[in-house]
Amino acid sequence: METGDELWTKVRKGLQDKLSKPTFETFIRPTGCSSFSNGELKLLAPNPFTSIRLREQLLPTIAEMATSISGRSVQVTVLAETALPKSEFVADAAAVELTDVSEPRRESAPARPSGQRRYLPALNPRYVFGRFVVGQNSRMAHAAALAVAEAPGREFNPLFICGGVGLGKTHLMQAIGHYRLEIDPGARVAYVSTETFTNDLIQAIRKDGMQAFRDRYRAADLILVDDIQFIEGKEYTQEEFFHTFNALHEAGRQVVIASDRPPSQIPRLQQRLISRFQMGLIADIQSPDLETRMAILQKKAEQERMALPRDLIQYIAGRFTSNIRELEGALTRAVAFASITGLPMTVESVAPMLDPTGQGVAVSPQQVIEKVSEVFDVTAEEMCSSTRRRAVSQARQVGMYLMRQGTDLSLPRIGDTFGGKDHTTVMYAIEQIEKKLASDPKLAGQVQKVRDLLQIDSRSKR
């Protein structure tokens, strides 16, 4: 009798041919098998959202495939690895406290006119799901965006995507629009910034065109509203957007909103709007980790047909950590610099251009490990192992210390680089090396030699 893992591997392979690629990659591939006994296949989803998605839409397909492969009836259940924070998901709108109980009667959204593809600003052709690199920082938001694109107005309405500047909120929003237009070319997809919504409202008031303004926005099948944080303090704009939101939501039209912060943290935002925005799913996008940044650079290089050495990708990914726009901008500058000067695309040639302030050159974690192992005469494998041999332990501590100085990795990420060490271990290592440097001339000389090889300055980032 085959094991659960064996059965799930076969089922997953069968589903890959049956489901769309985005659906398979987002919901099936990251899901594992928990157990299989007495005809029950228990699956383990990576997060609550995936679990909900599998149960509500994909469970019959999975069960059918499992039954077909095993040759007997198989019941499928889905568990989630982690619990979704209560503040991020409100399953029932009645659970949200509404402060405004004397709202005017809500208007129904008018039926959409036929034969018109788009009636608000066109979407950027580059912002599609296929060009979005999914990392741990964005997996939830990507999965939610895909679910909304496939079934608008059903699962999460509204979908509120929040995150810092340049992390991919606009990309995901517009990808939803592109996806819907591919499925339904006649869909009325409206992508609009909050500034444009406000300006349109002002013009409508000046020209006595409020009815046309309302019809225009409330006829959308899918409305994508960017930078909603700029609505703060604009009382009349908030009033009009509130009624537009209600008209669309009650008609089952999908609303997607993006902001640089959660609804509750937008100052001077009406409580009734906060409540509406929290009715669906709030999906957060964090800054990408090193691996995701490298994947983003590799993806962009492939799209632009550029051949880049891996150490250069590692260098740029380690040097620019705040957002994706900055990261891609650095790559563009590096390529332009090499093209203009005729220099090869190497870390040595582009690093001075990417670090014009002379405040120290960032390095990749792999470079730190390589140079430390070279100077301290241990192997990189030993440094990342659990061995406690004194020479290896000291080299490992030096590596953690210099990685903290020369890269933008957090303490937990440094620990991961050294074989999954805890962040407290990294903190201890840094403290130990700082103490020893003041009393051990030999160690100080070795550390300085590594610094020189890596071009790391001596300023501590603690």
UniProtKB/Swiss-Prot annotation:
Domain notes: Domain I is involved in oligomerization and binding regulators, domain II is flexibile and of varying length in different bacteria, domain III forms the AAA+ region, while domain IV binds dsDNA.
Domain I, interacts with DnaA modulators: annotated span: 1-80
Biological-process GO terms, alphabetical: DNA replication initiation; regulation of DNA replication
Similarity comment: family membership: Belongs to the DnaA family.
Job description of the protein: Plays an essential role in the initiation and regulation of chromosomal replication. ATP-DnaA binds to the origin of replication (oriC) to initiate formation of the DNA replication initiation complex once per cell cycle. Binds the DnaA box (a 9 base pair repeat at the origin) and separates the double-stranded (ds)DNA. Forms a right-handed helical filament on oriC DNA; dsDNA binds to the exterior of the filament while single-stranded (ss)DNA is stabiized in the filament's interior.
Residues reported to bind ATP: 166, 168-170
Gene Ontology molecular function: ATP binding; ATP hydrolysis activity; DNA replication origin binding; lipid binding
Region annotation (Domain III, AAA+ region) ranges: 122-338
Entry-linked InterPro entries: AAA+_ATPase (IPR003593), Chromosome_initiator_DnaA (IPR001957), Chromosome_initiator_DnaA-like (IPR020591), Chromosome_initiator_DnaA_CS (IPR018312), DnaA_C (IPR013159), DnaA_dom (IPR013317), DnaA_N_dom (IPR024633), DnaA_N_sf (IPR038454)
UniProt subunit comment: Oligomerizes as a right-handed, spiral filament on DNA at oriC.
CDD domains reported for this sequence: AAA (cd00009), Bac_DnaA_C (cd06571)
GO cellular component, one term: cytoplasm
Keywords assigned: ATP-binding, Cytoplasm, DNA replication, DNA-binding, Lipid-binding, Nucleotide-binding
Location, primary (coarse class): cytoplasm
Protein name: Chromosomal replication initiator protein DnaA
